């Protein structure tokens, strides 16, 4: 058990039958009354965000979330197949859990999966990945002064804006957090 006054950003707790991560907290001291803790939590299963106010003496059940290294193997219909790098077990994860990470995952990409017991909660990609451009317009010679960009389709199906000089079949480095082109690889 953890007191609500010990909550910090990133603290993970179990309350109301769900798993929650603390996004924000503030300690408010009232003039005559007791102190209150105003928090913002994100449900780790559904992604919904709620604001909660607690009295300073309340306690919550803290949980331990383990980060496991996994490797993306392939897509099976709608589901994604991953392999645990320690035990070599294969794990099936639904598209609702993978979410936007699928845009930057190609086969053999290593990811970190937050696990609570045997339940997968979230996927964290590496900050940068190297992907191949499969489709883009050819660059126009001499059109480099404007510093313009053009759309390019990557091997995973994602579309990113790249500089005009980048051509098809070029490997590029992409930031997975923002989806922006970083450099040629």
UniProtKB/Swiss-Prot annotation:
Belongs to the elongation factor P family. Signal peptide: none annotated. Involved in peptide bond synthesis. Stimulates efficient translation and peptide-bond synthesis on native or reconstituted 70S ribosomes in vitro. Probably functions indirectly by altering the affinity of the ribosome for aminoacyl-tRNA, thus increasing their reactivity as acceptors for peptidyl transferase. Pfam families: EFP, EFP_N, Elong-fact-P_C. One of its GO terms (molecular function) is translation elongation factor activity. It comes from Deinococcus deserti (strain DSM 17065 / CIP 109153 / LMG 22923 / VCD115). SUPFAM superfamilies: Nucleic acid-binding proteins, Translation proteins SH3-like domain. GO terms for biological process: peptide biosynthetic process. Keywords: Cytoplasm, Elongation factor, Protein biosynthesis. PANTHER family: ELONGATION FACTOR P, ELONGATION FACTOR P (EF-P) FAMILY PROTEIN. InterPro entries: Elong-fact-P_C (IPR015365), NA-bd_OB-fold (IPR012340), Rib_uL2_dom2 (IPR014722), Transl_elong_fac_P/YeiP (IPR020599), Transl_elong_KOW-like (IPR013185), Transl_elong_P/YeiP_cen (IPR001059), Transl_elong_P/YeiP_CS (IPR013852), Transl_elongation_fac_P (IPR011768). One of its GO terms (cellular component) is cytoplasm. This is Elongation factor P. The gene is efp. Pathway: Protein biosynthesis; polypeptide chain elongation. The keyword Transport does not apply. It comes from the Bacteria.
